[in-house]
Amino acid sequence: MTQWLQSGRRRDICALLYDAGALHGQELKSTLEATYDTRIEPAAFYGSLDALVGRGLVTKRTDGIHDVYRLTDAGVGGVESHYAWLSERLDAD
């Protein structure tokens, strides 16, 4: 399993992007905060996003004044691989 999946926040960001396709950074942060039912420090959140972009798992583009994030093919593969791994654990008899 790749290193980014060892971080719960990064994994959850990727899962949200997998579901949504593409999201503005603030929209993604708000969705994650609602999921966790807690506030996430902006520096920590955007640090996680920057790490995902740096690893080639997420792309970042500018749309007006907003940054928009989307999974790359490698990011999609990572989410699907993790889902398969998790499903095997849950389906084990």
Model-predicted segments: where are they?
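Short alpha-helical segments that sit at the start of domains
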Residues: 1-18
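Short helix-capping/hinge SLiMs at alpha-helix to coil transitions
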Residues: 17-20, 35-36
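Short acidic, hydrophobic short linear motifs in intrinsically disordered regions
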Residues: 23-33
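Short, hydrophobic-biased segments on the C-terminal half of alpha helices
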Residues: 46-50
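A short, conserved structural fragment
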Residues: 53-61
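Short, Lys/Arg-rich nucleic-acid/phosphate-binding segment
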Residues: 62-68
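Amphipathic alpha-helical dimerization/coiled-coil segments
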Residues: 80-93
